[in-house]
Amino acid sequence: ETVKFFSVIQNKLHFAATGMTAAELIQARADHQLPNMGLTSWKKTEVRKTDVAVAKNYLKEKEISELNRIVVMWLDFAEDQARRRKQIFMKDWEGKLDEFLRVNERDVLPNAGQISRQAAEDHARAEYDRFSAGRREFKELSAEKDYVKELEKTAKQLPENPKREQKKHDKK
């Protein structure tokens, strides 16, 4: 129940900032043809499969700013409720968030969204597999080009006519 609660809250916050749920963001933006698969942030030096199933990794700078602003206001509200010893149960927080978003003239998620979490993750992983294959091919081609350049550089350092050099050596 707790996991579902936080998932609902997260989706409501994403929707208020972007007009899409987390799953809808992933479904709409995971694209193997885009640079870094459409992600705007990821954990390591390059995009990994674990990064593509995280909705916030696709957010644009303005959306991140909006989401952060909403979350900070919401947490301040929740902290104020706690300090005043207002007893609010998890089931009530969902309604409180909807009220909070309306008061702040934000979009309120009317339902669970159009895309399931599983469908979004499946889509993102399939796109990642295509992206990863293309990235691997690009790296292999780059390595081959570097290898050819090294061979050409080494070839230029060789004597121009090795047979002529050999004859000079034989006469001595």
Give names to the regions the model predicted.
Residues 1-172:
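Positively charged, phosphate-engaging catalytic surfaces used for nucleic-acid and nucleotide handling
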